[in-house]
Structures are given as structure tokens and as C-alpha cells.
């Protein structure tokens, strides 16, 4: 059984967190135990409990087990620390150990990335290098907006060039007034080398909703049944 997935996006703010939430809810409703994982979270805020990130808290809220925050988000960077101008090392061993620990506890771990596929960490390395090291299959979130076809095709190409399988993509309607939505979905369906596994409509406060019904796990049926897939 394929245990781990990496969620990337065509850009920042395209809906990786709500899609991660939807996938976790869909897997959970199918009787699987799940956990969300946000290895590196930028823009975190200081709280009485320590640094906290709103996206990581969403993932924590839909995980099957009651897990400490640090198990979901081992590296939480403040707004200041999130700038690439703020140089600091990233402990990739910590990220790998955290992922391995979660993988031992649940059936599936949904790993949410930071920004897009080539978004840089504070050490000026893209997180995708760690994803390649971990050999994680990739699901891509496409925020449906002007220019998204170009961004989606470039992201899919970059994932393939890195030797990882793109196992599916999800359309997230981030602009309810966008014309030609159906045409964009049709073009992406024809050009992307992976199946469309879900469409999320525009929903206010989507991160607080039940979203599992928008994910078609049947499109991942053969993928879920294997231990490892090749690009």
C-alpha cells in the first residue's frame, strides 16, 4: 500500500492546504488512518504554545491521531525567517525522521509542500530536493486562474525531470468569476500526464469544511494498492 504523498502547487496560495485537507478526509472516510505533515511552514506566528502555522494546524485537525504539533510541523518559520534573504540551515534529517515516524503510525501521510515545486528554502535549496530524496509520489494542485495552464505544464515537466511520478492533479477554483473555467479544465485534462482526481469549487472558509466528497479516490485506485511506483 502506498503510504505517502507529496502535495505541490502551481504557485503560492493555490490551495495546497485545502486539497491536503480534502485528501485526508477522503482517505479517512474510506476507513484509513491518516496524518498530515507540513515539513517546513513559513509565516508562522508566536503563540503561548510556541510557533504555530495556520496551515499546519488545519492538517493537525484532520489527522486521525492526536499528535503533538511538532509531529505535524517540525520546522515553523516566522515571517522574518521565511524570507530567502534570511539565511538559515534547514535540518533535512529532522524532516525525514518526522516523516518516518508518522509513516509508522498511520496508513497514509499527506505531505504538504511550501510554495511551488522550485520554491526555495532559507538555504537556497528547493524543498523538492528533499522530496526526491524521500522518493515521494506527487499530487499537483492547480489553482484555476489566468496563466495556470503554463504553470501546470511547467510543474509537471519539472516533477518528471526530477524522476518522480506525478500521480494526479486537483483543480481548485480560486476565482469564482473566471471565464472559460470548463475549457481550462478540458485543456489541462488533455495535456497533463496524470488523471484529474478532484475539483474543488470556490468555497468561503474551505479550510473549515468537509471536502472529502470532492476527491475521487477511485482515480488513484491502482496507485493506492502498490508499495512503490516509478516515474
From Swiss-Prot:
GO molecular function: ATP binding; dethiobiotin synthase activity; magnesium ion binding
Pathway: Cofactor biosynthesis; biotin biosynthesis; biotin from 7,8-diaminononanoate: step 1/2
Main location class: cytoplasm
Gene (name only): bioD2
UniProt key word DNA repair: no
Catalysis: reaction(s): (7R,8S)-7,8-diammoniononanoate + CO2 + ATP = (4R,5S)-dethiobiotin + ADP + phosphate + 3 H(+)
InterPro entries tied to this protein: DTB_synth_BioD (IPR004472), P-loop_NTPase (IPR027417)
Enzyme class: ligase
Role this protein plays: Catalyzes a mechanistically unusual reaction, the ATP-dependent insertion of CO2 between the N7 and N8 nitrogen atoms of 7,8-diaminopelargonic acid (DAPA, also called 7,8-diammoniononanoate) to form a ureido ring.
CC terms in the record's Gene Ontology section: cytosol
Active site per UniProt: 38
Superkingdom of this protein's organism: Bacteria
UniProt cofactor(s): Mg(2+)
Ligand binding (Mg(2+)): 17, 55, 112
Subcellular location per the Swiss-Prot or TrEMBL entry: Cytoplasm
Keywords: ATP-binding, Biotin biosynthesis, Cytoplasm, Ligase, Magnesium, Metal-binding, Nucleotide-binding
EC number(s) per entry: 6.3.3.3
Subunit structure: Homodimer.
Record CDD domains: DTBS (cd03109)
Keyword Nucleotide-binding among UniProt keywords: yes
Gene3D superfamilies: P-loop containing nucleotide triphosphate hydrolases
Protein name: ATP-dependent dethiobiotin synthetase BioD 2
Amino acid at each position: 500500500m502506498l503510504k505517502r504523498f507529496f502535495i505541490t502547487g502551481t504557485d503560492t496560495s493555490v490551495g495546497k492546504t485545502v486539497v491536503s485537507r480534502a485528501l485526508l478526509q477522503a482517505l479517512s472516510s474510506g476507513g484509513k488512518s491518516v496524518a498530515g505533515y507540513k515539513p517546513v511552514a513559513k509565516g508562522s506566528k508566536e503563540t503561548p504554545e510556541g510557533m504555530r502555522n495556520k496551515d499546519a494546524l488545519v492538517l493537525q485537525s484532520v489527522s486521525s491521531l492526536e499528535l503533538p504539533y511538532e509531529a505535524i510541523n517540525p520546522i515553523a518559520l516566522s515571517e522574518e525567517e521565511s524570507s530567502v534573504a534570511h539565511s538559515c540551515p534547514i535540518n533535512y534529517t529532522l524532516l525525514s525522521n518526522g516523516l518516518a515516524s508518522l509513516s509508522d503510525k498511520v496508513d497514509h501521510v499527506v505531505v504538504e509542500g511550501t510554495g511551488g515545486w522550485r520554491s526555495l528554502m532559507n538555504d537556497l535549496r528547493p524543498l523538492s530536493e528533499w522530496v526526491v530524496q524521500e522518493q515521494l509520489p506527487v499530487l499537483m494542485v492547480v489553482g484555476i486562474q489566468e496563466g495556470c495552464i503554463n504553470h501546470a505544464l511547467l510543474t509537471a515537466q519539472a516533477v518528471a525531470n526530477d524522476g518522480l511520478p506525478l500521480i494526479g492533479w486537483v483543480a481548485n477554483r480560486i476565482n469564482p468569476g473566471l471565464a472559460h473555467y470548463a475549457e481550462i479544465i478540458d485543456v489541462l485534462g488533455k495535456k497533463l500526464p496524470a488523471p484529474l482526481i478532484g475539483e474543488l469549487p470556490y468555497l468561503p472558509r474551505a479550510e473549515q469544511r468537509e471536502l472529502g466528497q470532492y476527491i475521487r479516490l477511485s482515480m488513484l485506485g491502482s496507485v493506492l494498492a502498490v508499495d512503490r511506483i516509478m516515474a
